Regions:
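Single, function-defining residue in the core of a domain
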Residues: 1-102, 110-117, 122-278
Length: 278
């Protein structure tokens, strides 16, 4: 499909209040897709096209939410034919420290850096083909909350950034076609018990890298102990690069899995029980 036709199919129906604005969006997306390594002035064919793009961006009717909604709709349509859909959740920090005059930025992990935090859910086929975004949310941290980490156990998940994982999972259930099985993957920051306890369709599963060695249900076992005791199900060779005086080598990664019911953390014992996870 030509880039121009693809762009129209992807975002041509964006709800920007005017068909001409949607057409300009499709043109801009097509231009940027053709030259993803450059900015708008270089991607646009002429000075007039650059000026038109600038006017379009300055229009109050053009909102990130409307653009994203059109793309998410297209992603959901592409996902409908998948036997299993992978939904990859991740967090990115956009560092704008080099632009101190920029308004609206907030602190990042390093106190000297400022910018935005972006939470995305990327749909990927079982063959590893990216299908598009299912959800995205960006925000600037409030400087007044910097250094409040010591109070995290006294605050509910909804009052912490950890809520982003639950919101992403809820968005997946909202937009993915109902019959499509989904496996959501995320890194250690997503090891939040409320995420496992949150209601989700029975054919939506979670694959989360463990960060906390919590006790399993009413048992005395802990998940890392249980995993080590499970039989090896697969062996994958992994190339390990050189480190210091250590030469490069090939390691063998042994994959083990087991089913277990996770208990809730002690500070929230009365919430819904966690579903079994594997």
């Amino acid at each position: 499909m030509p880039a121009a036709a693809w762009a129209v199919a992807e975002v041509g129906a964006a709800g920007l209040g005017d068909a001409r604005r949607a057409a300009r969006l499709a043109t801009l997306v097509s231009d940027l897709a053709a030259r993803p390594d450059v900015g708008i002035p270089a991607a646009c064919a002429t000075p007039a096209a650059t000026k038109a793009a600038d006017r379009w961006l300055a229009n109050d009717a053009v909102t990130p939410e409307a653009i994203l909604a059109a793309h998410i709709t297209a992603t959901a349509e592409r996902s409908g034919g998948e036997a299993v859909l992978l939904a990859v959740q991740g967090t990115t920090a956009l560092d704008f420290s080099a632009q101190p005059a920029l308004a609206g930025a907030g602190p990042l992990a390093h106190p000297a850096h400022s910018g935005l935090v972006v939470q995305s859910v990327l749909a990927v086929s079982a063959d590893g083909v990216p299908l598009g975004l299912l959800h995205q949310h960006s925000w600037a941290r409030d400087p007044a909350t910097t250094g409040a980490r010591h109070t995290r156990r006294q605050r509910p998940t909804a009052a912490k950034e950890s809520q982003r994982w639950l919101d992403g999972q809820a968005a997946i259930a909202d937009v993915v076609p109902a019959a499509v099985p989904v496996l959501t993957g995320a890194d250690r920051e997503a090891d939040v018990c409320d995420l496992f306890a949150q209601s989700r369709p029975s054919h939506h599963e979670l694959l989360i890298r463990a960060a906390h060695n919590r006790r399993i249900g009413e048992e005395t076992r802990q998940p890392w102990t249980a995993a080590r005791a499970a039989p090896g199900g697969a062996v994958v060779p992994v190339a390990v690069g050189r480190g210091g005086a250590r030469p490069p080598r090939e390691a063998l990664l042994v994959l083990r899995w087991t089913a277990a019911a996770r208990g809730r953390r002690a500070i929230a014992p009365h919430g819904p029980p966690c579903r079994p996870c594997r």
